[in-house]
């Protein structure tokens, strides 16, 4: 093989490496994206449904409304996140939020739940929200997330923090909870994107 041909092969390899960069999601380990919301529609990336939930749908003084926002955590101009407008300012006990089906997903090879979150500075937002995971037996384990800011922030919660779940081979649901004890202010909005299981 002459020098000109060798040089051509080397250049082709270099150009291919530049054109196809390694995925940032895979750079530090393994990741399964559950929901990137980029379609701006249901279902999530693993075929699961999702939406807002209310403790008492008949109580108009409280509730969460879910919508798609064209504010992507990774800066994708065509991407989306979900926006959760919550209200727990009620004379009645109030809690509500967001649910997402995980369809029995096996998370055994992963060790952390990751996602991006930020608050809406214009409307106001709680600096704390409760994050729950449920297994197939509907056993719920919760983690109180704090330090939410008005800028996108990547959250990584080790599975060990969800200490009531002992079997990670079949998970049923991811839940966000706003409540009248921890959500201050009692009405506001947060955005969430790129929900995933990761091995870190």
Task: Label each PLM-derived region with a short phrase.
Residues 23-200:
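Beta-rich carbohydrate-recognition modules and glycan-binding surfaces
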Residues 1-10:
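Bacterial N-terminal signal peptides that target proteins for export
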Residues 16-24:
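C-terminal segment of classical bacterial N-terminal signal peptides
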